[in-house]
Structure formats: C-alpha cells, structure tokens
Amino acid sequence: QGPSPRHPIPP
C-alpha cells in the first residue's frame, strides 16, 4: 500500500 495520512486534507 501507500502512505496514508492520519488527518484529512485541509480545504
């Protein structure tokens, strides 16, 4: 798998 951020992307 790839890198998964633990926080959502800011708008």
From Swiss-Prot:
**Keyword set for this entry?**
Hypotensive agent, Metalloenzyme inhibitor, Metalloprotease inhibitor, Protease inhibitor, Pyrrolidone carboxylic acid, Secreted, Toxin
The GO cellular component terms are: extracellular region
Q: Which residues carry this modification: Pyrrolidone carboxylic acid?
A: Q1
* Keyword hit for Secreted: yes
Which locations, inside or outside the cell, does it occupy? Secreted
* Tissue specificity comment: Expressed by the venom gland.
Segments forming a coiled coil:
none
Q: Which GO terms describe its molecular function?
A: peptidase inhibitor activity; toxin activity
Is the keyword Coiled coil assigned to this protein? no
Name this protein carries in UniProt: Bradykinin-potentiating peptide 11a
Q: Which GO terms describe its biological process?
A: regulation of blood pressure
Protein function: This peptide both inhibits the activity of the angiotensin-converting enzyme (ACE) and enhances the action of bradykinin by inhibiting the peptidases that inactivate it. It acts as an indirect hypotensive agent.
**What family does this belong to?**
Belongs to the bradykinin-potentiating peptide family.
